[in-house]
Amino acid sequence: MVLHQQRFSLDHGAFCQTLAQTENLLIVQDLDGVCMELVQDPLSRRLDADYVRATTLFAEHFYVLTNGEHVGKRGVQGIVEQSFGDASFVQQEGLYLPGLAAGGVQWQDRHGKVSHPGVGQTELEFLAAVPEKITNCLKTFFGDRPHSLSPEQLQTGIEASVLDNVASPTANLNTLANLLQDFPQIYRDLQETMAQLLDQLMAEAVAQGLGNSFFVHYAPNLGRDERGKEIIRWAKAGDSGTTDFQFMLRGGVKEAGVLALLNRYYHNRTGQYPLGESFSARQAPPSHQDLLHLVKAQFDPALMPLIIGVGDTVTSQVDEATGEIRRGGSDRQFLQLIQDLGDWGNHGNLVVYVDSSQGEVKNRQPLQLETVAGQTQVVAGPGDMRDREEPLKINVAFPGGHDQYVAAFKQAAQRRRVHFSQ
């Protein structure tokens, strides 16, 4: 059975062969938890230099798509530079990871040139003030209640939690969640306080005439409510729930980023932009069906590549009180779009899941494995086992996490180099 017809395949050899021998190929890959460990402090992230080199062998067939950012203190640019120990070498050799960050509104090329298509200066100025507000909110929160953290722990926790991203300032509570693991109610109150802060920021944006500029992203989440707002995943025993509270530019959603990347890919192949040269993720329609319709209307299906979507954040949870299924995860929508585009074009696109639950962040459900007739199989995915109508079909799984995926990716890159040099 071919890979796109399989569920949770562990045939990584076939996966490598697909990447190595498919000429018209587009890889759209998340970063954190996929090609590097999911850690509490983003400043401690590391990238394998050989993996970075391997991405260059895919040339214009590889793009990243992340809710993190390329630039800034916690940007991926610095992680790549650290991998090689020489920023000028990375820039000259074109070793930066190309693609979209901040959900789809921050573009970077191989040489580290960064832009924000469709973003106004007033919007960036508003975002620049957000990190200080997050810092002040955290200080007030801990100043208003008794807690067991030492001054040093609290300072470390706050510094690790405030991500001063240019286009997506974020409160990342991973470190504080770990420090507060014996005080679940304080952490639960902290989640609620962060959500209230983001609501307050939205109100301030509206007052300044920027009501249509931003939205709130929670990661991981439980999907969206009837108003289109993302639903927080509250912490529970052994599960830190939503840890990333992001104030993002509207249009900065990964599924819109898929269209922006596909638009660039077609231009690389044909010299023409199906959606126009100036198209950005911010111009994409908001609904899944409208995104599909736009692709069907503007992109030549005969030129459509085999798209490989790679992510690590997909959730589903059954509400114990109502029985309602909440499906979420920051990678769900872009992976679903890639799956549906494959169904439309009959190209057999692949949805690839990397199990990042072994990392420091404890809010992922690990894949469950069993040995059946001598073969290891995935018997339970990252969602709720009671969700029998899960629409997202994960084709290939990497239960060994980012190390296992990176090893396969590097192998595929070398095979591709040999295959297309003959």
UniProtKB/Swiss-Prot annotation:
Active site: D403
InterPro entries: Acid_Pase_AS, GGPPase
A molecular function GO annotation: glucosylglycerol 3-phosphatase activity
Swiss-Prot/TrEMBL catalytic activity: 2-O-(alpha-D-glucopyranosyl)-sn-glycerol 3-phosphate + H2O = 2-O-(alpha-D-glucopyranosyl)glycerol + phosphate
Alphabetically ordered keywords of this record: Hydrolase
The EC number(s) this enzyme carries: 3.1.3.69
Pfam families, sorted: Salt_tol_Pase
Domain of life, source organism: Bacteria
Family from the record: Belongs to the histidine acid phosphatase family.
Role this protein plays: Phosphorylates glucosylglycerol-phosphate the precursor of the osmoprotectant glucosylglycerol necessary for salt adaptation of Synechocystis.
Subunit structure: Monomer. Interacts with GGPS.
Family annotation (NCBIfam families): salt_tol_Pase
Protein name: Glucosylglycerol-phosphate phosphatase
UniProt organism field: Synechocystis sp. (strain ATCC 27184 / PCC 6803 / Kazusa)
Gene of this entry: stpA
